[in-house]
């Protein structure tokens, strides 16, 4: 089993770190692949450059030998999760796509979502007792497992008020953000 955990990681928080640890603890995968999204989201005006986000994830996970960070989505064009998983499946067997359960309600709007559902298994992350729409999951035909976690930490809240939220960041990530003066001009 290899888990693929994608996200903007803008910035990666201690909640992301806790999720990685819990995924490893609960599912015992051979590897967890972290896939930061590329810079192609024109509607995400506060998304800092891929290289900074990649480096922060690297700093946060450097002590975890079961984590690998992928540059696969560092492209100029949006290709979609199916394309990413398809490319990764050329190197890894038994892929599971880790996704927040709240994203499932819009899954039918994703690029190549039917192929994604047909070809890959999911691990649905549920935060703070999120209620699943079992009818929707059944209708989609999703092959999935669930993992619950408790957290109120939000990357967007950290970006809005960095100084008040530094305690929600891994020490290495915090140092990197301060040294590189990231998120100083973010106005969300």
From Swiss-Prot:
Give me the reactions it catalyses: nicotinate beta-D-ribonucleotide + ATP + H(+) = deamido-NAD(+) + diphosphate
The name this protein carries in UniProt is: Probable nicotinate-nucleotide adenylyltransferase
- HAMAP family referenced in this protein's UniProt entry, alphabetically: NaMN_adenylyltr
| Free-text function comment from the UniProt entry | Catalyzes the reversible adenylation of nicotinate mononucleotide (NaMN) to nicotinic acid adenine dinucleotide (NaAD).
Query: InterPro entries from the xrefs?
Result: Cyt_trans-like, NadD/NMNAT, Rossmann-like_a/b/a_fold
| UniProt EC number | 2.7.7.18
Q: Which SUPFAM superfamilies match?
A: Nucleotidylyl transferase
Pathway, per record: Cofactor biosynthesis; NAD(+) biosynthesis; deamido-NAD(+) from nicotinate D-ribonucleotide: step 1/1
Q: Which GO terms describe its molecular function?
A: ATP binding; nicotinate-nucleotide adenylyltransferase activity
- Which GO biological-process labels does this protein carry? NAD biosynthetic process
Which terms are listed as keywords in the entry?
Answer: ATP-binding, NAD, Nucleotide-binding, Nucleotidyltransferase, Pyridine nucleotide biosynthesis, Transferase
